[in-house]
Regions:
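Extended alpha-helical coiled-coil "stalk/arm" regions
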Residues: 21-59
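Short, charge/polar-rich alpha-helical segments
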Residues: 1-36, 67-71
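Long amphipathic alpha-helical coiled-coil segments
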Residues: 65-92
Length: 92
């Protein structure tokens, strides 16, 4: 295989890894936000919480689904990074 083809493939993999890393970071942020919102719900009055929910400021975060997404994205990112390492070895 030509080194140009490998370099192009490496670029595609880098873009994919970057996209997965960004999605993973957003999922982690959603999980952190859910924890903050859960804490706020306990600290604030019920009427305030209801008002904030109506406004969309407080959301009912499904943490189980977010945790599953984080697990999946982490595995996907590791797989892409493994392939990247293999391609980089071939380029060297």
């Amino acid at each position: 295989m030509r080194s140009v083809d490998l370099a192009l493939y490496a670029d595609e993999l880098a873009a994919e890894a970057s996209m997965l890393a960004a999605r993973l970071e957003r999922a982690r942020c959603r999980l952190q936000r859910a924890a903050l919102e859960r804490e706020a719900r306990h600290a604030l009055e019920a009427t305030t919480v209801e008002r904030l929910e109506v406004l969309g400021v407080l959301r009912c975060g499904e943490t189980r689904a977010v945790r599953a997404e984080i697990t999946d994205l982490t595995a996907s990112l590791r797989a892409v990074e493994s392939l990247q390492a293999w391609v980089e070895e071939r380029l060297a």
